[in-house]
């Protein structure tokens, strides 16, 4: 069973202590206003996926193809749009809002991230 994911923003890091008093580093993530925009089906697209959007955008800030796709789906345009491949029993209807309640306590998750670009740093000095 492959479930849909969420788009989040990293807030920072902190530590949590277990019962033995050992500290564990944890990353704090903010779950934004994620909404399912649409779905990909095996019949039409060859794979099954949920299309999730985060942070509503003004019409002037998005490309015309994205605006047309959002209008067809009946949702507002979003700044960040991501597809999550899922199994056929985990398709979420378009227009459904996703939140942190999507997960249960103690559940393991896979995380993907984009690191901040630092540009060309030049030659290393001694």
What kind of region is each of these model predictions?
Residues 1-126:
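Extended basic (Lys/Arg/His-rich) segments that typically form rRNA-contacting surfaces
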């Amino acid at each position: 069973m492959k479930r849909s994911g969420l788009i989040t923003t990293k807030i920072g890091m902190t530590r949590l202590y277990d019962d033995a008093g050992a500290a564990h580093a944890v990353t704090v993530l903010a779950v934004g206003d994620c909404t399912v925009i649409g779905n990909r089906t095996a019949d039409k697209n060859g794979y099954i996926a949920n299309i999730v959007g985060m942070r509503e955008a003004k019409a002037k800030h998005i490309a015309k193809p994205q605006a047309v796709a959002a209008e067809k789906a009946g949702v507002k345009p979003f700044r960040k749009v991501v597809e999550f491949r899922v199994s056929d029993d985990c398709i979420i209807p378009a227009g459904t809002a996703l939140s942190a309640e999507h997960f249960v306590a103690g559940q393991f998750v896979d995380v993907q991230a984009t690191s901040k670009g630092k540009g060309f740093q030049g030659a290393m000095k001694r």
